[in-house]
């Protein structure tokens, strides 16, 4: 999907805020800890290349989801280490060696498939993924980890790192977190040779479990100024939200009592009202369940009336405003603010999803 720069809807990305968040987090973790910036999913909707270029001097490497995201960074001139967190296809090994990527190895079957196809593994760098309780990918038994490490090293692979991912680091109870941590430590203790890099800390672990950090952290949601727990846990220190979503009024009218708005005529004015149209809709990631949520105009909360359409929403204004008046969907307007977490709470989801769903049709502007 191409960006639509000829309409007022845009996402403003404060790159300085992201850098400040990295520095803030860095000040609260053990000195010498490597900082890996997670820029997968287009940097959580913020723009992977622009963000990576802005922060490359503040971090020690990058994490992405798949090899295509990694190639995008390399082709944009980013030279720092890139770890691909997901399982890669067998055909990706040659690309990983060509572009100097680090692959994740999560199972013996994957290694055996490479050996069966006689893929040249010499010079490949990998991290071993441990499934300590997340349940997605990774080795679950110490014996499998030992076998994998031996096989890889026998075929010229550099096993540089080992890592896991916590499922509940952003929740109030530590019970499951501690159980995962112990499983991971048990596997580490069983290894004849522990890889150089050991990392288990995502944003939530970095914020609320700093005492469990090994020698690297993966900075994701928090790097963009978002609270990984939503509204469950208070941040231990201030972070600056980096993304503002705004648009403008493109049509304003006064309608009589009884006038209906949107598909299904689900909203009917109970009096004479001022209704405005804003060019954003579910094709932009502003989903249909946002009906009745309020956006900000002139520092005032204005409810979305009628269903969210593919490309447009209608809002109720307290009075007529000129065409072009700014509408804030995420961010500050006057003395009021809408956060991604507030949007997520309304949708019964998480702030990660809110920013990741913002489509490419919305131009990103950086400052």
Curated annotation (Swiss-Prot):
KW Isomerase (keyword) present: yes
| Pfam families in the record | Ala_racemase_C, Ala_racemase_N
Reported cofactor(s): pyridoxal 5'-phosphate
Q: Which reaction does it catalyse?
A: L-alanine = D-alanine
Its domain of life reads Bacteria
- Cellular compartments per GO CC: cytosol
Instruction: Please provide the record's keywords in A-Z order.
Output: Isomerase, Pyridoxal phosphate
**Residues binding substrate:** 136, 310
Instruction: Give the matching SMART domains.
Output: Ala_racemase_C
Biochemical pathway = Amino-acid biosynthesis; D-alanine biosynthesis; D-alanine from L-alanine: step 1/1
Which residues does the record list as N6-(pyridoxal phosphate)lysine (modified residue)? 40
Please give a single GO biological process term from the UniProt record: peptidoglycan biosynthetic process
Give this protein's Gene Ontology molecular function annotations.
alanine racemase activity; pyridoxal phosphate binding
According to the UniProt entry, the coiled-coil residues are: none
Active site residues of this protein: 40, 263
Which EC numbers characterise this protein's activity in its record?
A: 5.1.1.1
Q: Which family does it belong to?
A: Belongs to the alanine racemase family.
Q: Provide the function of this protein.
A: Catalyzes the interconversion of L-alanine and D-alanine. May also act on other amino acids.
Protein name per Swiss-Prot or TrEMBL = Alanine racemase
Taxonomic source organism: Streptococcus pneumoniae serotype 19F (strain G54)
The coding gene here is alr
């Amino acid at each position: 999907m191409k960006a639509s720069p000829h309409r007022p809807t845009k996402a403003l990305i404060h790159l300085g805020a992201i850098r400040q968040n990295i520095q803030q987090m860095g000040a609260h973790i053990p000195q010498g800890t490597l900082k890996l910036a997670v820029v997968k999913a287009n940097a959580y909707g913020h723009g992977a290349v622009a963000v990576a270029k802005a922060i490359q001097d503040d971090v020690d490497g990058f994490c992405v989801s798949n090899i295509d995201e990694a190639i995008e960074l390399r082709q944009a001139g980013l030279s720092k280490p890139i770890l691909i967190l997901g399982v890669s296809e067998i055909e990706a090994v040659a690309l990983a060696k060509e572009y100097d990527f680090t692959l994740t190895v999560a199972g013996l079957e994957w290694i055996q498939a490479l050996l069966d196809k006689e893929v040249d593994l010499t010079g490949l760098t990998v991290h071993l993924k441990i499934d300590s309780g997340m349940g997605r990918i990774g080795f679950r038994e110490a014996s499998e980890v030992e076998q994998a490490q031996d096989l890889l090293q026998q075929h010229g692979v550099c096993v540089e790192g080992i890592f896991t991912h916590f499922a509940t680091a952003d929740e109030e109870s530590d019970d499951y977190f501690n159980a995962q941590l112990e499983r991971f430590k048990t596997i580490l203790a069983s290894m004849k040779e522990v890889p150089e890099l050991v990392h288990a800390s995502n944003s939530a672990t970095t914020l609320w479990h700093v005492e469990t950090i090994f020698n690297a952290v993966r900075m994701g949601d928090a790097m963009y100024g978002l609270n990984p727990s939503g509204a469950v846990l208070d941040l231990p220190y201030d972070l600056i939200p980096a993304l503002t979503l705004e648009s403008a009024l493109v049509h304003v009218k006064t309608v009589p009592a009884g006038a209906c708005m949107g598909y299904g005529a689900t909203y009917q004015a109970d009096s004479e009202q001022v209704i405005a149209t804003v060019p954003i809709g579910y094709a932009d990631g502003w989903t249909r369940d946002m009906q009745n949520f309020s956006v900000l105009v002139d520092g005032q909360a204005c409810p979305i009336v009628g269903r969210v359409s593919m490309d447009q929403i209608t809002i109720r204004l307290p009075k007529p405003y000129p065409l072009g008046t700014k509408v804030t969907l995420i961010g500050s307007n006057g003395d009021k603010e809408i956060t991604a977490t507030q949007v997520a709470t309304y949708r019964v989801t998480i702030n990660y999803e809110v920013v990741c769903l913002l489509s490419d049709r919305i131009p990103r502007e950086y400052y």
